[in-house]
Design a protein with these regions (language model features):
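A conserved catalytic-core segment of Leloir-type glycosyltransferases
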Residues: 48-112, 116
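Short helix-terminating capping/connector loops at secondary-structure junctions
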Residues: 7-8, 115-119
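Short glycine-/acidic-enriched loop or helix-start segments at secondary-structure transitions
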Residues: 24-25, 56-57, 89, 132-135
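Short, solvent-exposed loop/turn segments at secondary-structure junctions
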Residues: 19-20, 51-52, 84-85, 128-130
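Glycine-centered short loops/turns at secondary-structure junctions
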Residues: 41, 142-143
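N-terminal subdomain of nucleotide-sugar transferases
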Residues: 2-73
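An aromatic- and histidine-rich active-site surface loop
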Residues: 23, 94-109, 119-142
Length: 143
């Protein structure tokens, strides 16, 4: 992140499982990090899940599409389907959902903020562990 050292505003892609208004603990942390970076003047493009944490199901008013893109003053938020299962007890189903979610996040991260623009860095929140690998691939294609 040499841009921080020389005063340059950075262009970042942020991958995370939750973001406001989805207020899982990781959503609170990632929302704060993004807002703090935006306050410093950085351009951020968040790729996250549709809100689903509270009931382990996509919240009312958010369903119907595989992804949604919102423009913000500091960049954009792309929300993708989290593929939640009906129960948290089926570990195989949950693992499959995380892999599928990470794959869709990866595809959307390649175009977050527009094509074919380069980014200065990728910030990937884990868990799920699959988002780390997704972030690495995103950086390979976007740097």
């Amino acid at each position: 992140m040499n841009g921080v050292m020389n005063g340059k505003n950075l262009r970042l892609v942020v991958l995370c499982p939750h973001f406001a208004p989805d207020m899982a603990p990781t959503g609170v942390v990632m929302t704060r990090i993004v807002h703090e970076l935006a306050a410093l003047g950085h351009e951020l493009h968040v790729v996250t899940a549709l809100p689903w944490y509270r009931e382990h199901a996509i919240e009312t008013g958010w369903g119907g599409r595989l992804w949604r893109v919102e423009k913000t003053a500091w960049g954009s938020i792309t929300r993708v389907h989290p593929f939640p299962g009906k129960t948290k007890r089926n570990l195989l189903r949950r693992a499959f959902g995380f892999v599928l979610f990470s794959a869709v996040v990866g595809l959307r991260s390649l175009v977050a903020g527009g094509l074919p623009r380069r980014v200065d860095g990728v910030l990937a929140m884990s868990p799920p562990l699959t988002l780390g690998l997704t972030g690495w691939f995103t950086k390979l294609f976007r740097s």
